[in-house]
Regions:
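Cell-envelope/ECM-targeting effectors and their regulatory/trafficking segments
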Residues: 1-96
Length: 96
């Protein structure tokens, strides 16, 4: 699995690109972090490479926001390459 995203993932209304390969990477990392931290609220409920257009219905956006809250990061529902959220997620999932 690649350990980097090329564009932003998360809330469409925040301008996220949500490219399928990037979304899949984030979803897999969230799954891994949910298991490692024993935090089911971080589980995006599947890896399909998609973000619901209505963020309130997106399990992935909910998982991103739960991760940001747990990590004391500003909650915006967005993960950008090399952002604080990305770095924390990589660490939580055991990535580099």
């Amino acid at each position: 699995m690649s350990s980097q995203i090329s564009r932003s993932v998360g809330r469409w209304e925040k301008g996220a690109s949500n490219l399928q390969p990037d979304v899949e990477i984030v979803q897999r990392l969230l799954e891994t972090a949910a298991h490692a931290l024993q935090a089911p609220e971080l589980d995006p409920k599947g890896v399909d490479g998609k973000i619901a257009q209505v963020s309130a219905k997106s399990n992935t956006v909910a998982a991103i926001e739960a991760f940001q809250s747990r990590s004391n990061i500003s909650i915006d529902g967005l993960i950008e390459p090399d952002s604080q959220t990305w770095q924390a997620l990589m660490q939580a999932a055991g990535g580099t």
